[in-house]
Amino acid sequence: MELNEVTISRAIIDRFYEKLIANLEVDVAVVGGGPSGLVAAWRLARAGRKVALFERKLSIGGGMWGGAMLFNEIVVQKSALHVLDAMEIGYRLYAEDYYTADAVEAISTLTSQAAKAGVAIFNCVTVEDVMIRPDRIVGLVLNWSPVEMAGLHVDPLAMRASFVIDATGHATEVVHVVAKKVPGTLRTDSGKIEGEKSMWSDRAESLTLENTREVYPGLYVAGMAGNATFGGPRMGAIFGGMLLSGEKVAAEILERLE
């Protein structure tokens, strides 16, 4: 059979259209495809919830690909090994409570497991605003990342979600939108974004879990976005806190969706 270029185009357009239409209303929208966002999405999808993940870049994975300074190994502490085990990601003991994993294997497996669990992943999509009702986030306003990068005047599309997770890391992209458009209303000490502090790995890892919480009705922060929002330090290339943060935010949202 001779391949037909138009049939190839139709197949891609039809399937993407089906996926997009099916995910205009979801239980949870995850913004950011790094480790915390992927773990959260995976846990939620495995529990039977409808989850869509939006990543502004072409590739999924956040900063995990490069390990530290492009040395593509990561460190995970013992308390988070159960997440690696559940996802079938290999690791090796380096020293007491320090385990290493191949960064490429880790993030590619996280992505694969999330997709296989039923998470709808949309890459190259930017969240430019939130959809709001009185005192609550109820969805996202989306556009293509290249549209934003080119500075084109193109109106966005909106989608609805019962809960939104900002897992955009240092940038805290969704929280910044809320802080700008609904000022003084964040559940931080100042009502504003407190800002990320300089590196302190031990403190950062514990605060990552503490700061994984609802920052505005309907909007949760996870991973480094939590520390950047609530004023915690950065942790470097140790990822146990990221994995556990994704697990925690999923558990809290699942409890509220019951």
From Swiss-Prot:
Q: Where does the chain bind NAD(+)? A: S36, E55, R56, G63, V127, H153, V154, D155, M224
Q: Where does the chain bind Fe cation?
A: D155, H170
Keyword NAD present in the record's keywords: the answer is yes
- Which Pfam families does UniProt cross-reference here? Thi4
* Pathway membership, UniProt: Cofactor biosynthesis; thiamine diphosphate biosynthesis
InterPro entries from the UniProt entry: FAD/NAD-bd_sf, Thi4_fam, Thi4_prok
Membrane-spanning residues where? none
Entry annotated with the keyword Transferase: yes
Q: Which reaction does it catalyse?
A: hydrogen sulfide + glycine + NAD(+) = ADP-5-ethyl-4-methylthiazole-2-carboxylate + nicotinamide + 3 H2O + H(+)
Q: Which domain of life is it from?
A: Bacteria
Q: Which HAMAP family match?
A: Thi4
Q: What does this protein do?
A: Involved in the biosynthesis of the thiazole moiety of thiamine. Catalyzes the conversion of NAD and glycine to adenosine diphosphate 5-(2-hydroxyethyl)-4-methylthiazole-2-carboxylate (ADT), an adenylated thiazole intermediate, using free sulfide as a source of sulfur.
Q: What is this protein called?
A: Thiamine thiazole synthase
From which organism does this entry originate? Desulfosudis oleivorans (strain DSM 6200 / JCM 39069 / Hxd3)
Taxonomic path: Bacteria, Pseudomonadati, Thermodesulfobacteriota, Desulfobacteria, Desulfobacterales
- What would be the name of the gene that encodes this protein? thi4
